[in-house]
C-alpha cells in the first residue's frame, strides 16, 4: 500500500533565507499539494549558539509572502529533546549505539597518522564493542560521545529522484557520533528521528546533504524505519557562477519584496530554477502545482539571472490589478516623502499606477514614476533653458488656452496638442518636452496626453500659465 505523501522543509534558523534556500521549500510544498499530501515545516534549531528567533521569523515571513503554507508545524527540534534522548537510550540498550571515550586530541592524532599513511581519515572503532573484544578502561572523569554502530559490510543504495541510483559502500562510512558528551543529539541523528516520527515519504533538499544520506538511511533502517524517496537538488549558483550564499552577496527573500518584486513572479522564477515543463516560462502557482513532478527536476546547477526575474516581474506587474499595485506602491511613496494628503488631493493612485505599470519592472519603479503626480514640480534650470525657449512660448500660451476649452479626455487633449503643433509648425517633442517639464517637473513621462489628463485641467493650465507669466 502506498503511503500518503508527506514532505518537509527543514531550515536551520542561523541567518537570513535566500532564494536558494527557499527553493527547497517550494518544491516539497508543490509536490505535497500536487499529491494531495501534507507539507511539514520543521525548524532545525539544535545549533543553539547560531540559531535565533529573528531567523525563524524571517523563514516564516518569507514562506507566508510566497504563499508556501504548511499543514503541520513549525516543529522545533529543541522541543523534541526528550524524544531524541528516548531513542538514544533505546539504541544503547539494543546495541545500536555505544559510548566512545576517544578525546578530540586522540581523534586528531589518529586522523593525522591515517593521512600520513595515505588512508582516508576516519574513526577506527577503538571503543566499538565486538564479540571477544576487550575494550579499554574508560578514563576517569571523561564523558563519552555516543556513536552509531554502522554496518561494517554491504552497500547503502537508494534511487535518487535527481541523481539516479546511488551506491555507497559501508566500508566508506565510520561510526557516526550521534550524541555529544553532554548528551545533546547531533543533527544527523535528529533528522532521522524526525523523518521517521513524522512519516516523511519524500525528502527534497539541496545536494549539499547528499553525503549525509547514507548515514541517515543506515540509522533509519536500524530503528526499523522505511527510508523516504530522496531528491537532491543541484546547487543554485549566483550570477558569477558561485554557490548562492550570503557571503557571495545573495539577497534575502524579503529583500525582493522590499525591492518591489511580486511574490507570484518570484515563485514562477524559482519554479524554473531547477525544474521545467517543456518550454513553459510563465505559469500561475496553480498551473505549477498541477505540472510539478520529480522526474523533470534539473540535474545540473541552476544559475540565478536577475534580468530574467525582472522580466517575469514586469509581466506580472502588467497583469496585476491596479488597486493591488497601488496598495503595494504606497510604502514606496511614503519612503519618497509623498504625504497622504498629497495622494488624497491628487490624481487617483489606482489610475496613476495603471499608467505607470507598463514601463516598470518593479513596484518601486512604479512609485518612483508616480511620485511626480503628488509633488510640486521643480524642473532643472538647464532643462528649462533648453526646452522652454522664447520660440515655443507662444505655442505654450495657445495650448493652455485650448486646454481650458477642451473636453478633458485623452482624445481631446491629444487633439489640442496636435492643433497647436500645426498652428506653430512644431514637432511633438518641441512642445511635449516643455509641457512635461512645466507640469511634471521632468522630461521622462509616459504618453504626454495620458499624463496631462491625470494631472487634471486646473493643474496643467495653471502650471503652464505660471511659467509664462
Swiss-Prot record:
It catalyses: tRNA(Glu) + L-glutamate + ATP = L-glutamyl-tRNA(Glu) + AMP + diphosphate. A motif ('HIGH' region) lies at residues 11-21. It is found in: Cytoplasm. It comes from the Bacteria. SUPFAM superfamilies: An anticodon-binding domain of class I aminoacyl-tRNA synthetases (SSF48163), Nucleotidylyl transferase (SSF52374). Its EC number is 6.1.1.17. GO terms for biological process: glutamyl-tRNA aminoacylation. One of its GO terms (molecular function) is ATP binding. Keywords: Aminoacyl-tRNA synthetase, ATP-binding, Cytoplasm, Ligase, Nucleotide-binding, Protein biosynthesis. Coiled coil: none annotated. Transmembrane segments: none annotated. ATP binds at residue 246. Pfam families: Anticodon_2, tRNA-synt_1c. One of its GO terms (cellular component) is cytosol. A motif ('KMSKS' region) lies at residues 243-247. Monomer. Catalyzes the attachment of glutamate to tRNA(Glu) in a two-step reaction: glutamate is first activated by ATP to form Glu-AMP and then transferred to the acceptor end of tRNA(Glu). Belongs to the class-I aminoacyl-tRNA synthetase family. Glutamate--tRNA ligase type 1 subfamily. This is Glutamate--tRNA ligase. It comes from Burkholderia ambifaria (strain MC40-6). The gene is gltX.
Amino acid at each position: 500500500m502506498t503511503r500518503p505523501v508527506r514532505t518537509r522543509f527543514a531550515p536551520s534558523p542561523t541567518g537570513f533565507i535566500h532564494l536558494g534556500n527557499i527553493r527547497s521549500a517550494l518544491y516539497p510544498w508543490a509536490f505535497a499539494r500536487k499529491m494531495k499530501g501534507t507539507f511539514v515545516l520543521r525548524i532545525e534549531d539544535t545549533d543553539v549558539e547560531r540559531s535565533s528567533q529573528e531567523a525563524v521569523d524571517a523563514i516564516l515571513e518569507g514562506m507566508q509572502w510566497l504563499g508556501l503554507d504548511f499543514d503541520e508545524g513549525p516543529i522545533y527540534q529543541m522541543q523534541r529533546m526528550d524524544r531524541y534522548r528516548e531513542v538514544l537510550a533505546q539504541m544503547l540498550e539494543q546495541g545500536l549505539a555505544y559510548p566512545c571515550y576517544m578525546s578530540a586530541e586522540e581523534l586528531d592524532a589518529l586522523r593525522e597518522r591515517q593521512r600520513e599513511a595515505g588512508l582516508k581519515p576516519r574513526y577506527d572503532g577503538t571503543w566499538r564493542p565486538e564479540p571477544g573484544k576487550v575494550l579499554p578502561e574508560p578514563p576517569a572523569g571523561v564523558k563519552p560521545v555516543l556513536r552509531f554502530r554502522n554496518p561494517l559490510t554491504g552497500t547503502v543504495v537508494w534511487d535518487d529522484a535527481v541523481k539516479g541510483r546511488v551506491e555507497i559502500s559501508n566500508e566508506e562510512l565510520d561510526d557516526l557520533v550521534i550524541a555529544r558528551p553532554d548528551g545533546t543529539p547531533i543533527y544527523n541523528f535528529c533528522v532521522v528521528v524526525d523523518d521517521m516520527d513524522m512519516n516523511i515519504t519524500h525528502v527534497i533538499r539541496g545536494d549539499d546533504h547528499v553525503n549525509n544520506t547514507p548515514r541517515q538511511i543506515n540509522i533509519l533502517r536500524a530503528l526499523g524505519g522505511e527510508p523516504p524517496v530522496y531528491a537532491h537538488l543541484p546547487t543554485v549558483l549566483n550570477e558569477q557562477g558561485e554557490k548562492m550564499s550570503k557571503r557571495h552577496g545573495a539577497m534575502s527573500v524579503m529583500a525582493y519584496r522590499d525591492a518591489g518584486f511580486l511574490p507570484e513572479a518570484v515563485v514562477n522564477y524559482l519554479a524554473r530554477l531547477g525544474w521545467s515543463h517543456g518550454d513553459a516560462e510563465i505559469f500561475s502557482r496553480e498551473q505549477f502545482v498541477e505540472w510539478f513532478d520529480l522526474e523533470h527536476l534539473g540535474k545540473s546547477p541552476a544559475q540565478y539571472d536577475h534580468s530574467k526575474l525582472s522580466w517575469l516581474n514586469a509581466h506580472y506587474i502588467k497583469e496585476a490589478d491596479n488597486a493591488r499595485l497601488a496598495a503595494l506602491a504606497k510604502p514606496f511613496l511614503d519612503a519618497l516623502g509623498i504625504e497622504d494628503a498629497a495622494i488624497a488631493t491628487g490624481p487617483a493612485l489606482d489610475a496613476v499606477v495603471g499608467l505607470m505599470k507598463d514601463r516598470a519592472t518593479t513596484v518601486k519603479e512604479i512609485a518612483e514614476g508616480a511620485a511626480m503626480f503628488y509633488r510640486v514640480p521643480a524642473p532643472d534650470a538647464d532643462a528649462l533653458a533648453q526646452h522652454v525657449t522664447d520660440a515655443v512660448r507662444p505655442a505654450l500660451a495657445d495650448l493652455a488656452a485650448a486646454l481650458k476649452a477642451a473636453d478633458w479626455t485623452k482624445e481631446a487633449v491629444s487633439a489640442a496638442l496636435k492643433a497647436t503643433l500645426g498652428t506653430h509648425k512644431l514637432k511633438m517633442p518641441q512642445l511635449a518636452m516643455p509641457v512635461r517639464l512645466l507640469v511634471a517637473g521632468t522630461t521622462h513621462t509616459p504618453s504626454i496626453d495620458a499624463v496631462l489628463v491625470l494631472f487634471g485641467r486646473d493643474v496643467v493650465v495653471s502650471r503652464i500659465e505660471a511659467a509664462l507669466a
